[in-house]
C-alpha cells in the first residue's frame, strides 16, 4: 500500500465513521429526514423484525412512523463500529448497538436492547451513503448443545 492509498483509506474510514455517527445522532434527535439522508436514493433497509423498506422515501416514512410512539424516547448508541473497505467506493460496516428508552407495542417500557447492523456503503459523488442496511436484535452467545450422536 502506498502512502497515498494509506492516507486515502484513513480519510475514507473517517468519512464512513461520520456517517455512522450521523445516523446515531439523527435517530436520537428523532429526525427521520436526517436519518434517511444517510441512505442512497434506492437503498434497501431490513429492520430487526424483517420488514423490508425500499428506497429513501420509504425509509424516512417508516422511521418517522416508528418514532411517533415506540421509539420517541429511545436512545440508540453505536457501541462498536467495524469498517472494512472492499474497494475505493464500497465498504461493509458492522455496528454493535444498544438501545434504551423505547416502548413495546403494548405501551409497556421496553427492556434495554442490543443488536448488530450490517451496512453496505457506497461512495457517490464524494459522499458515502448506505446502499443496504440489515438490523438484528442479538442475544447473549451460548455454547451449541452437543447432544447425543446418532450412528448410522
Q: Can you describe what each PLM-predicted range is?
A:
Residues 2-37, 44-152:
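A beta-strand edge to alpha-helix "cap/lid" segment located at domain peripheries
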Amino acid at each position: 500500500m502506498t502512502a497515498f492509498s494509506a492516507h486515502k483509506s484513513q480519510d475514507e474510514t473517517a468519512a464512513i465513521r461520520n456517517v455512522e455517527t450521523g445516523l446515531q445522532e439523527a435517530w436520537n434527535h428523532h429526525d427521520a429526514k436526517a436519518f434517511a439522508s444517510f441512505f442512497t436514493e434506492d437503498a434497501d433497509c431490513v429492520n430487526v423484525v424483517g420488514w423490508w423498506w425500499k428506497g429513501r422515501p420509504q425509509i424516512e416514512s417508516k422511521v418517522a412512523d416508528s418514532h411517533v410512539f415506540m421509539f420517541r424516547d429511545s436512545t440508540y448508541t453505536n457501541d462498536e463500529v467495524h469498517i472494512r473497505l472492499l474497494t475505493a467506493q464500497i465498504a461493509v460496516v458492522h455496528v454493535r448497538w444498544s438501545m434504551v428508552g423505547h416502548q413495546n407495542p403494548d405501551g409497556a417500557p421496553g427492556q434495554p436492547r442490543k443488536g448488530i447492523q450490517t451496512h453496505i456503503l457506497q461512495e457517490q459523488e464524494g459522499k458515502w451513503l448506505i446502499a443496504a442496511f440489515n438490523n438484528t436484535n442479538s442475544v447473549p452467545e451460548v455454547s451449541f448443545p452437543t447432544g447425543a450422536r446418532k450412528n448410522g
